[in-house]
A protein has these predicted regions:
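Residue-level recognition of single "structural anchor" positions
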Residues: 1-12, 55, 74-82, 91
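Short, conserved catalytic/metal-binding motifs centered on acidic residues
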Residues: 4, 29, 62-65, 138, ...
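Active-site beta-loop-alpha junctions of metal-dependent nucleic acid enzymes
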Residues: 24, 33-56
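RNase H-like two-metal-ion nuclease catalytic core shared by retroviral integrases
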Residues: 64-66, 70-79, 86-112, 125-127, ...
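Short, solvent-exposed helix-loop connector elements
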Residues: 111-127, 145-150
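Protein C-terminal end segments and domain termini
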Residues: 130, 163, 167-168, 180-184, ...
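Charged, gly/pro-enriched flexible loop segments at helix/strand junctions
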Residues: 132-168
Length: 241
């Protein structure tokens, strides 16, 4: 399981802001997220526990980057006590965590944008999405491709990909997924409506946008950023003018 943190600090990393703890299973591309306030080690550990509890399959190994939120006694001790292998990315080798980095972009940044979130209300909305509609929509209805072969010929790189599947399909096709897990996933899938999930995601993103704008609109004199006009697209998040 690759793990990373996505900072919602906007244009400045001063003060306390929300961080999305993002986790991806390499074999199936299944993704889960959890928003925490700040980068505290104990909060990060609690987020990992919550994420692990929502995963449809068991964990064997966690592989974070080199941030102090993950490389610390609390996380290491938890991994040791729960019999998890603990590895980490090599310094300055961002591709070591390429799968979760892709999900950071697709499932977090492209959804909620690059602006600053730093309130409990915003945290509640993000986690409402991560715990419910967003995780269901991304894992059951958005396909991902696996790289099958990569060849270099005369200075050109040729890549061949496997047939695109959703994380749900990858898990259902995996012989290592238990029958109990497959039955639970199938039952959940049969009760989902992607159009309804999408509408609910858009409604919650709209509410998140309204809270963000109201936050800066009430503090114009103290914050120059609030004078900037933001446009909001519910499907992709905020975009600066």
């Amino acid at each position: 399981i690759q793990i990373d943190g996505v900072e919602h600090c906007g244009q400045t990393n001063q003060g306390e802001f929300l961080v999305t703890i993002s986790a991806t299973d390499v074999s199936s591309h299944w993704w889960e997220g959890e928003a925490v306030l700040g980068k505290g080690q104990t909060r990060t550990l609690e987020a990992l526990k919550a994420i692990r509890g929502r995963f449809p399959i068991g964990w064997q190994e966690i592989h974070p980057d080199n941030g102090s939120s993950f490389i610390n006694y609390f996380v290491y001790d938890y991994a040791h006590k729960t019999k998890l292998e603990f590895s980490r990315s090599r310094p300055y080798k961002k591709n070591d965590n390429c799968f979760v980095e892709q999900k950071n972009s697709k499932n977090v940044r492209q959804v909620v944008g690059h602006v600053r979130y730093d309130t409990i209300r915003e945290q509640d909305i993000l986690n409402d999405l991560y715990h419910n509609e967003l995780r269901l929509y991304k894992n059951f209805f958005q396909a991902a491709m696996r790289l099958e072969t990569k060849e270099r010929n005369n200075g050109h790189i040729y890549r061949k990909y496997q047939e695109a599947k959703t994380p749900y399909q990858y898990l259902m096709d995996n012989p290592n997924t238990t029958e109990e897990a497959k039955q639970k996933l199938k039952s959940e899938y049969e009760n989902l409506n992607p159009a309804k999930l999408k509408r609910s995601i858009q409604a919650k993103l709209k509410l998140l946008g309204e809270i963000y704008k109201a936050k800066y609109g009430t503090n114009i004199a103290q914050n120059d950023e609030s004078k900037v006009t933001f446009s909001f697209d519910p499907t992709t998040g905020f975009r600066l003018p």
